[in-house]
């Protein structure tokens, strides 16, 4: 009579007979870590690992000195920084611009292929683990991720620029076609391709942390490509994590810089007081950085999160304000055209090349490739956030949500704000007085010019200033925490003073960006972002390769391999031996049988089994029971069955 066994880690039941041969059990226990077959493993969460976190003094010292040295150089010799960065940018655009374009296209294709392949059912967590957030809450958080400083700064400025000065060969400037064409071009830059760059980092971090049990470092994602166990203290690992920190610092500093420019212009308009150059913006960076530091050292994170949630509502309210008091019917009428243009013009826009003449080179350098580089620099920061909120989601759920929910939000925001701006230009000619891009106000001023022409705009302006200030603080605070984690071996609770250090570095870079750009501050932002993002572009490509390799040996994929082989071989054997009259049974096959489900597959190979072998904080082997979900040396570790997973809260 069969007796049931306890549930194995996959959450299903098996049956066994009391007479199971002891030799078979002995072989299994000594062939696999902790006596569990890799196909039966439920996954491993980093929250259930014994990890010794600590400050990586090498990364902190090397990256910190480089950044501080750059800030000092930029403050003392901003013209020299601009000259060097401009020359470097020219080289990057000519010799490596294609890499950014291929990345933006390739990541969309790669993620969609994963989502709709058999790997799409693999969870970013343990087998049977439920998502920490409901679908509605998760969608809302992705929704919120699409709103920020850039939406308000570029929302009116970018579409109007494309309307007056389109991509070479795309459409006639100022025409009917230019209305939807301009908004579609902006949607291309801020839409699915942008979020694919973020999503590859989020997917990789979520998979290696909550499915493979490794710390959430950029280096731990691609470590398997080099054949060794992940080591955060190796030269290669430190180089990768250092590049991630540098990219995040410069990418986020750019957002802080444009935020300060826009707040400064808003303060000047509301107060009637002005100062020469970027003096007000520089002062705002200082004041808001102090606010960020207070947030980091005082432990008021809960209050900041509450304020951030309020800010999301204010941002939605701002979009609703534009929609209601602006040209509502016009906006509704252009939505279908924008969507169709977005889809139909994407191949031409993505295929635009630096080899198509000087005008195209100028457009791509100033816009398309700059944006791909900016999103690369933001990828470590945004990706870590997306991974945290997506624990328990399947790869298919994650990819479809991460690509399309925030993209829909930001495209909608651009259509409303940018569409209103284009409508004002078409009906009143009041934004660019002579109808050319050359007559546009400064980028930081355009939003305020548009707002001033809407009923009630003067009342809304102070609210927008506060909203931008909160976006500044929450962005700087969150990015500093991520950089602090990267420089402390993935510590989920990094030291506050190191977080403060990275916040100061970020502010310093933002100051240098404004100083090097002078009156055209965006020039400094664009140069430095594109240059510093290039090395991390290579890291993103390696991430995709490493992820594909690990998914092929995931417990789910191994089970799927056995299932396919078992069914196919059993069917052939049944037809050969019994014709139409056969049924499937599970039985042990003699060694070397061609019809064995595992024939030709080495389930004891190191690349398949070593990753779930448990160790203590010093890397010494310890015993672990995957059925009970606990360490056996001291009886501590995860509580409850392995399939449930620790909450981590």
Labelled PLM ranges:
Residues 1-42, 561-649:
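Long, low-complexity, intrinsically disordered cytosolic termini of multi-pass membrane proteins
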Residues 2-178, 320, 550-551, 605, ...:
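N-terminal alpha-helical transmembrane segments of multi-pass membrane transport
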Residues 32, 51-61, 66-75, 108-113, ...:
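Helix-loop-helix module between adjacent transmembrane segments
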Residues 44-50, 217-232, 259-282, 315-318, ...:
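Helix-loop-helix connectors at the membrane interface of multi-pass transporters/channels
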Residues 62, 93-99, 103-106, 240-248, ...:
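Membrane-interface loop-to-helix entry segments
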Residues 73-86, 117-121, 156-157, 252-271, ...:
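Transmembrane helix-loop junctions in multi-pass membrane proteins
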């Amino acid at each position: 009579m069969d007796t049931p066994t306890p549930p194995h880690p996959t959450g299903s039941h098996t049956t066994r007979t009391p007479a199971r041969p002891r030799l078979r059990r002995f072989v299994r226990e000594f062939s696999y870590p902790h006596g569990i077959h890799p196909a039966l493993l439920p996954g491993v969460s980093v929250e259930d690992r014994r990890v010794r976190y600590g400050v990586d003094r090498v990364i902190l010292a090397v990256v910190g000195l480089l950044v501080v040295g750059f800030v000092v150089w930029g403050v003392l010799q901003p013209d020299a920084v601009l000259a060097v960065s401009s020359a470097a940018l020219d080289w990057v655009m000519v010799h490596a611009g294609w890499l950014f374009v291929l990345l933006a296209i390739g990541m969309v294709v790669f993620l969609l292929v994963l989502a709709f392949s058999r790997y799409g059912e693999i969870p970013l967590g343990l087998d049977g683990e439920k998502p920490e957030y409901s679908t509605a809450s998760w969608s809302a958080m992705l929704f919120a991720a699409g709103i920020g400083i850039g939406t308000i700064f570029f929302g009116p400025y970018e579409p109007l620029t494309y309307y007056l000065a389109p991509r070479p060969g795309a459409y006639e400037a100022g025409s009917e076609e230019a209305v939807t064409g301009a908004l579609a071009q902006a949607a291309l830059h801020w839409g699915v391709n942008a979020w694919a760059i973020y999503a590859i980092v989020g997917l990789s971090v979520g998979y290696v942390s909550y499915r493979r049990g490794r710390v959430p470092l950029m280096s731990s994602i691609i470590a398997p490509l080099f054949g060794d166990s992940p080591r955060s203290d190796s030269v290669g690992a430190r180089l990768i994590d250092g590049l991630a920190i540098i990219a995040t610092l410069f990418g986020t500093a750019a957002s802080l810089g444009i935020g300060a420019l826009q707040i400064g212009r808003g303060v000047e308009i509301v107060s009637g007081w002005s100062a020469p150059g970027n003096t007000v913006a520089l002062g705002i960076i200082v004041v808001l950085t102090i606010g960020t530091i207070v947030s980091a050292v005082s432990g008021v994170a809960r209050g900041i999160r509450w304020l951030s949630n309020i800010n999301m509502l204010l941002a939605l309210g701002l979009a609703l304000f534009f929609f209601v008091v602006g040209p509502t019917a016009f906006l509704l009428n252009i939505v279908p055209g924008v969507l169709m243009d977005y889809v139909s013009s994407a191949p031409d826009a993505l295929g635009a090349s630096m080899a198509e003449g000087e005008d195209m080179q100028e457009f791509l350098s100033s816009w398309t490739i700059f944006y791909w580089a900016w999103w690369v620099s933001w990828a470590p920061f945004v990706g870590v956030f997306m991974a945290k909120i997506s624990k328990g989601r399947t790869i298919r759920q994650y990819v479809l949500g991460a690509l399309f929910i925030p993209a829909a939000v930001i495209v909608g925001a651009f259509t409303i704000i940018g569409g209103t701006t284009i409508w004002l230009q078409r009906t009143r000619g009041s934004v660019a007085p002579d109808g050319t891009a050359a007559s546009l106000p400064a980028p930081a001023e355009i939003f305020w010019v548009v707002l001033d022409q809407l009923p009630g705009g003067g009342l809304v302006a102070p609210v927008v200033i506060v909203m931008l200030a909160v976006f500044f603080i929450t962005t700087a605070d969150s990015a500093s925490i991520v950089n602090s984690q990267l420089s402390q071996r993935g510590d989920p609770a990094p030291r506050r003073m190191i977080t403060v250090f990275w916040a100061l570095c970020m502010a310093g870079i933002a100051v240098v960006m404004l100083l090097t750009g002078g009156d055209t501050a965006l020039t400094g932002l664009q140069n430095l972002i594109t240059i510093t993002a290039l090395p991390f572009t290579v890291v993103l490509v390696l991430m995709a390769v490493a992820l594909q390799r690990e998914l092929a040996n995931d417990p789910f994929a191994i089970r799927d391999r056995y299932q396919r082989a078992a069914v196919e071989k059993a069917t052939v054997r049944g037809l050969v031996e019994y014709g139409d009259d056969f049924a499937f049974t599970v039985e042990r096959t003699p060694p070397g049988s061609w019809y064995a489900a595992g024939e030709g597959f080495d389930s004891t190979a190191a690349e398949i089994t070593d990753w779930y072998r448990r160790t203590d904080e010093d890397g010494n082997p310890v015993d672990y029971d995957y059925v009970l979900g606990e360490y056996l040396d001291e009886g501590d570790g995860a509580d409850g069955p392995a399939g449930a997973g620790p909450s981590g809260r």
